[in-house]
């Protein structure tokens, strides 16, 4: 099937992918635009996974103040080059992360940042709750693990559902930007203040 330049251009405009990548995706899917988007997304996220281990020492520190100065967030997000740090896509991502922190009040950046004693304390609470509810011993560990995942979704920034689209997490949002920008992106740290706390 012959793929028209206008179809390739439409796919490029909608995805931000390169011309040849769009053409190959359309050829692979027989000219189906929606399937081609999925192919590009899968390839993009595969590339994003490869970039995750790379050093990220450039980036931005972003300040967000909300509610007439009653709530503030300071977040550091790193990327690999100053060029990417200056792009609108990167700046928008950093702002969205700051809004997420302001709205959802996470306590940790990543699961690895949660202290082991906090995890053990949470597990003990969930285990006792399950026992008090009379749950069978053989399923208590699964219940505890499920509740621990919910704890991560509420307290860990990267695991939280994105406030603008809860079908993806903040980690997914970052992976999409890694695929788009071609560089590793890391949320280094954040602080959230509420007046009077």
Swiss-Prot record:
Keyword Cytoplasm annotated: yes
Keyword Protein biosynthesis in annotation: yes
PROSITE patterns linked: EF_TS_1 (PS01126), EF_TS_2 (PS01127)
Signal peptide: none
Region Involved in Mg(2+) ion dislocation from EF-Tu, residue ranges: 81-84
Gene Ontology cellular component annotations, sorted alphabetically: cytoplasm
Pfam family, one: EF_TS
Stated family: Belongs to the EF-Ts family.
Protein name: Elongation factor Ts
